[in-house]
Amino acid sequence: VTLSDNSRFVAKPVSHDPRTDLAIIKIDAGDRVLPVIQLGTSGDLMPGETVIAVGNAYGYEHTVTRGIISALHRTVQVSDVQYYHDLIQTDASINPGNSGGPLLNIDGELIGINVAVRVGAQGIGFALPVDKVLSIASDLCSLRRLESREHGITFTSLNNREQGLLVSSIEAGSAAQKAGLKPGDRIQRVESSNMQWPLELEMALLGQKAGQNIPLSVLRDGETLKLDLVLNASAPKATSVADRAWTQLGLRLQPLSASQLLDKKSKYRGGLTVTAVRPGSPA
């Protein structure tokens, strides 16, 4: 990973979503404090609004282009694997190398991630809304996905400019229920970290030891409560054969029964049909 001052770091992949081609990577910068982009919201965007796209178009670093939001809620299919819903359409110039770059509002806040451009057309580019990006990132960095553990909390919305995470439901028997959390609570802090996005909660809980008290500051009916969340030990990861075939080989497989093979006049009593192949995979 190369930063704007040309300092370089080796990145470690954490998690990846093949449907949107979004990935979480991690770098070790030591004691250095890295600048971060300010997050906006895509919940109040309007056609005609000015936007700014940043990227490495054709290898030209830090290319900045300006345009407007042309439309919202677009659907675009890039490949058999990548199928985007609810995209932002913009006429800001987006070229090869811009993919993965930020789409900003006039306040410099992140409102989307540039993901696609209409080949052969001018002024038609697409970005994944930041609220969707945060939802995907929260799942990619979740306790459930990375450590096979559950906190049992569901939140109402990602479109949240107020401090705190509004709890919509609590899973029965979960760590959250045992801690005393209830629907309607607003989680303001985990340990000493302020909470605004569910992704921040997942990041704060990752790596916490089993049985350790994790202090929460919770607002309930105008009163601030102090609760302790205790996570269980990691459960063994159970990965299905179908998931391994897709992630490692790039194959989607459908079992064939003996009767189906009989119709095909096959000498075998069972088998698999290839229903999809991931582009660029070993298959």
Regions found by a protein language model. Name each.
Residues 1-183, 189-212, 219-224, 230-259, ...:
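Serine-dependent protease modules
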Residues 260-267, 271-283:
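C-terminal soluble interaction/assembly domains
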